[in-house]
C-alpha cells in the first residue's frame, strides 16, 4: 500500500509557484487573491486564515474582506463588482457557506469568470464539460487529478466510482475522470446499493461527509482510494469518510486524512490565482 501524500506534493507546488511569482514580479505583476468572508463561522474563519497563510508562503498577496453577518446581498455584490474591475486583483473567492439571506448561486455567478479561481462560474463549468482548459478548474477535483498524476496512476480504462454528487467535488470530478478516459459511476444519497458499485471499482473517490462510509467489505483488493471527507469527531480528531485502518489493508494507493486531498485543494487555489495573474501578463 502506498500513501498518496498530498502534503508533500503541495509543498513542492508552492515552491514552484514561488518561482513563478518572482518572475511575474520582475514583469511588474504581483499575484493577488481577494477572499470574502461573511459572518463569524469558526470553521470558515479557520479556512480563510489557512488560505491567507498559504498565499504568504508562496508570494501571493492576499486581501481578506471580513463582513458582518448582516451584510446585505446588494452590499456583497457591490464589493465583488469593485474587485471585478480592480486590475491588481487576479482571483476572487467567496468563503462558503453564506448566511441564509444571501443567494449563493447569484453571488458565485457575479464573480467575473477570469477571476473565478474556485472554478464555480457557469462559464468555467462549461469549459470543463467541453474538455477545454481555457478556464479554471474546481480546486478539490483538480488537486485529486494532480495527486494521481504525480504517482503515475493511469486512469485510462479504469472503473471509477465517486460517492457524492455535489457541484464542488462530485460532478466536476466525474467530468475530469471522463476526460481522462475512465469509466465513471456517480453514487449519491439515493443510490440503493452502494457496495454493488464500489466492489467492482478500480478507483473510489469519497466525498460525502460521513464517517466510515466506505468499509473494507465494500472494496476489492488493489483498489485506489481517495478520501475527500473531513469530519471532526467529538474527541477533536479529524477523520475522513473512509475506514482508513481497514480499507488501507486492501488498497494499492490511499490518501490519508489529514494530509491527503486537503493540502492539494489549497495548492490548486494558489495555482489558479497565479495562472490568472499570468493571463494578465499575456
Curated annotation (Swiss-Prot):
Example of a GO MF term? methylenetetrahydrofolate dehydrogenase (NADP+) activity
What does the record give as the reaction this protein catalyses? (6R)-5,10-methylene-5,6,7,8-tetrahydrofolate + NADP(+) = (6R)-5,10-methenyltetrahydrofolate + NADPH; (6R)-5,10-methenyltetrahydrofolate + H2O = (6R)-10-formyltetrahydrofolate + H(+)
Its family remark reads: Belongs to the tetrahydrofolate dehydrogenase/cyclohydrolase family.
Primary gene name:
folD
The catalytic activity of this protein is classed by the Enzyme Commission as 1.5.1.5, 3.5.4.9
Which lineage is the organism of this entry classified under, starting from the top rank? Answer: Bacteria, Pseudomonadati, Campylobacterota, Epsilonproteobacteria, Campylobacterales
**Cited InterPro entries:** Aminoacid_DH-like_N_sf (IPR046346), NAD(P)-bd_dom_sf (IPR036291), THF_DH/CycHdrlase (IPR000672), THF_DH/CycHdrlase_cat_dom (IPR020630), THF_DH/CycHdrlase_CS (IPR020867), THF_DH/CycHdrlase_NAD-bd_dom (IPR020631)
Pathway(s) annotated for this protein in UniProt: One-carbon metabolism; tetrahydrofolate interconversion
Q: Which UniProt keywords apply?
A: Amino-acid biosynthesis, Histidine biosynthesis, Hydrolase, Methionine biosynthesis, Multifunctional enzyme, NADP, One-carbon metabolism, Oxidoreductase, Purine biosynthesis
Q: What does this protein do?
A: Catalyzes the oxidation of 5,10-methylenetetrahydrofolate to 5,10-methenyltetrahydrofolate and then the hydrolysis of 5,10-methenyltetrahydrofolate to 10-formyltetrahydrofolate.
UniProt-recorded name of the protein:
Bifunctional protein FolD
Q: Which domain of life is it from?
A: Bacteria
Q: Name one GO biological process term.
A: L-histidine biosynthetic process
* Keyword Hydrolase applies: yes
Residues that hold NADP(+) according to the record: 164-166, 189, 230
Q: Which organism was this protein described from?
A: Campylobacter jejuni (strain RM1221)
Gene Ontology CC entries for this record? cytosol
Q: How does it assemble?
A: Homodimer.
Amino acid at each position: 500500500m502506498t500513501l498518496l501524500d498530498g502534503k508533500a506534493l503541495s509543498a513542492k507546488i508552492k515552491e514552484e509557484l514561488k518561482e513563478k511569482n518572482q518572475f511575474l514580479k520582475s514583469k511588474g505583476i504581483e499575484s493577488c487573491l481577494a477572499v470574502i468572508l461573511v459572518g463569524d463561522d469558526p470553521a470558515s474563519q479557520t479556512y480563510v486564515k489557512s488560505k491567507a497563510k498559504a498565499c504568504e508562503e508562496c508570494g501571493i498577496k492576499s486581501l481578506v474582506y471580513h463582513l458582518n453577518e448582516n451584510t446585505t446581498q446588494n452590499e456583497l455584490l457591490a464589493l465583488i463588482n469593485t474587485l471585478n474591475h480592480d486590475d491588481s486583483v487576479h482571483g476572487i473567492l467567496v468563503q462558503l457557506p453564506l448566511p441564509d439571506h444571501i443567494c449563493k448561486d447569484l453571488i458565485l455567478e457575479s464573480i467575473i469568470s477570469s477571476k473565478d479561481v474556485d472554478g464555480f462560474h457557469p462559464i468555467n463549468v462549461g469549459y470543463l464539460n467541453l474538455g477545454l482548459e481555457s478556464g479554471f478548474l474546481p480546486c478539490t477535483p483538480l488537486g485529486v487529478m494532480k495527486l494521481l498524476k504525480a504517482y503515475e496512476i493511469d486512469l485510462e480504462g479504469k472503473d471509477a466510482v465517486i460517492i457524492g454528487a455535489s457541484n464542488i467535488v462530485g460532478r466536476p470530478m466525474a467530468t475530469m475522470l471522463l476526460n481522462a478516459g475512465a469509466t465513471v459511476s456517480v453514487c449519491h444519497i439515493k443510490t440503493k446499493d452502494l457496495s454493488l458499485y464500489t466492489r467492482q471499482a478500480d478507483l473510489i473517490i469519497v466525498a460525502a461527509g460521513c464517517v466510515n462510509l466506505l468499509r473494507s467489505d465494500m472494496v476489492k483488493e488493489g483498489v485506489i482510494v481517495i478520501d475527500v471527507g473531513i469530519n471532526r469527531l467529538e474527541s477533536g480528531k479529524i477523520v475522513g469518510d473512509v475506514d482508513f485502518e481497514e480499507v488501507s489493508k486492501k488498497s494499492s494507493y490511499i490518501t490519508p486524512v489529514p494530509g491527503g486531498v486537503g493540502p492539494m485543494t489549497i495548492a490548486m487555489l494558489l495555482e489558479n490565482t497565479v495562472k490568472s495573474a499570468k493571463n494578465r501578463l499575456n
